[in-house]
Amino acid sequence: MKKKYSFRKFSNDIHLWLGIASGLVLFVVCLTGTILTFEKEIVEWADSERYHVEAAAGATVIPIDELVAKTEAGLKGKVTGIEIPANPNAVYRFTVQEKGPKGGKPEEGKGDRMKNAEGGGMKKAEAGPGAKAEGPKGGKGGGGKTYLVNPYNGDITGTTKSATAEFFSTMMGLHRWLLLQDSGGKIIVGAATIIFVFLVLSGLVLWWPIKLRNWKQGFQIKFSGNWKRINHDLHNTLGFYSFVVLLIMALTGLCWSFEWYKTGVSDVLGDEVFKQRREKPMPSDPMNAGNAAKPMLASLISSADQSFPYEGNYRLRFPADSAGSYVINKSRSGFFVLTAADKIQFEQYTGAVLKTEKFSDKPFNEQVASSVRSLHLGDIYGTFSKIIYFLACLFATSLPVTGTIIWINKLRKKNKKQAAGKRRVQRLQQHQATTVVV
């Protein structure tokens, strides 16, 4: 009697054939995603002579306004943004619009790459104060370039460009569009990501035990078994333990891949995803230019500290024109902290507070919409969540490999059964022929 085609069998077929169709692409995307998880930490470690400073005992940082003046004088350019880390042994990052005969694009750092992708793919992103806000743009005088500055003596230790940074840029290109930026790579990655969502869901159906007494098997790997059993358990168990994080990665990553998807998510949340990309600072009144002394950056940072009284990282964005304003984003730093930034804007001529945005005061839907990037990258809760994302992405990288091995083993088993069946038929036919002859 023919077996009924069950939902479980349907899920198995979906899981198998979609996995075969997308396995190679998903392997590349997950592997590069794993590598990119700790991009910032690896770059700063590999190029530590640029990013790390040792302060002498009792040394104090140069006041920020003096540091800006010294940097502008030394580089003969205009500072358009600053990143000030909470770590006292880390350099400041200054984005400088250098004077030159030709304007251009700002130097791309990790955050700038991610911003440029906001409208298209699963990109990771840091560097430069524009990383989580709007990146400083090049103008008539030249492009914005990110310099690393020692806050204790004002020396420039280098820029964010290096062989290590170039390596991660290549990893980003693979992760985002398989190095096929203008040849449909984004669509291929996006389609594979949609398939991945179905693979995770169908895999969960297949993991679900038919009998209650088999629940325990789904939570552990039987290392005492043969290699086929271990491979099966690795695929089954690691997939289960990581499925929640993998779904979050995939569902948020699609916001870069397809505009229609991003629009749909924005409609569901009731708030625009990546709206920071188009959001303009509050306007300043140019009529105030001659009526007041220009505010000191130190006083603006002090005012931000009063609104957000905690130790953290700062990202300062300077006014882009006579009607622009100063924007300061402040975020917590630590092993297990919510890294979402609070934001405050100041009138550029008077230093008056124009707008204060505290992340915790936002409605939940706006918090989610503004956290899509962090939910995809895994830095939503600092190093703690990055470790979890790293492991989940590493597990995901192994799934196409272990899944392919399971499929090959089943094919071999099926072929052996078919061969054994043919041999039985042949023996039976020979026996019948012998009987007839006798």
Spans of features found by a protein language model:
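Conserved histidines in hydrophobic membrane contexts and catalytic metal-binding motifs
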Residues: 1-438
